[in-house]
Amino acid sequence: SVIIPVHNEEKNILSLTDEICVALDNLVNYEIICVDDGSTDDTRDKIIQLTSRLRNVRLVQHEIKGGQSAALYNGVVAAKGSIIVTIDGDGQNDPADIPILLDVFHSNLSDNPVLMIAGWRKGRKDTILKRVSSIIANFIRSRILGDAVPDTGCGLKIFRRSDFMEFPAFKNMHRFLPALAIRSGGVVISEVVNHRERKAGISKYGTFDRLWVGIADLFGVAWLLRRKFPDANPHQYKSDN
């Protein structure tokens, strides 16, 4: 299941969905879930057009804007697939990277009970201010959480649906998915992905939003990581009677 959280992306959602279909053409069973997070433009109508043209496209509609984490969460809840792929709705993530990340995921699946593949936008096509603020935000987060993931803000991620549903759900959780996977005893593998310039629309985050928004959540997640149950190696005693 491919989850696309979108808000006011009427000029990007059609071409992005078509690109995903091309990238996943060799897969027999997949679905695309577009979660419209209370858009005020024609995004919803564009997605409805897609659902009438493509049988594997579904719409989850937020009547009011709930935020990216809520859109992601409700998309995963609605998903029928056991493997989840997330991708941003602005078209800057390249759908052609999805099959590559899926290969990495399946190659490492048997060795790890909880596994997440996280995209790494090493050559970002953003302004210098955005790149600098993102570097600072990733540095602060990594120092506090110790997740050693270079780019948690990349929308391209792959994980099991069942693993995600075990994560605690909270506002801005999408910023901390790798840390939550590690908290669950998992492994996060970062893979370099292509990053493209935004062709249309405007960014939903200001230049320094990614630095300051979620600071309280950052310390909350740090507390959560410290409060993890110790591995007590539990087993049930069986009586001989």
Question: Where are these predicted regions, by residue range?
Answer:
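Residues that recognize and position ribonucleotide moieties
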Residues: V77, K130, K157, H174-R175
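Structured catalytic core of nucleotide-sugar glycosyltransferases
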Residues: S1-T127, S162, E166-F167, A179-R183, ...
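Hydrophobic helical membrane-anchoring modules
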Residues: G146, K171-N241
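Short, flexible, basic/aromatic active-site loop/helix in glycosyltransferases
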Residues: H106-T152, K157-I158, D163-M165, F219
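Short clusters of hydrophobic/aromatic residues that line enzyme substrate/ligand-binding pockets
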Residues: L24, V149, Y205
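Short, hinge-like loop/turn segments at secondary-structure boundaries
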Residues: V76-A78, D103, S133-A137, G206-D209
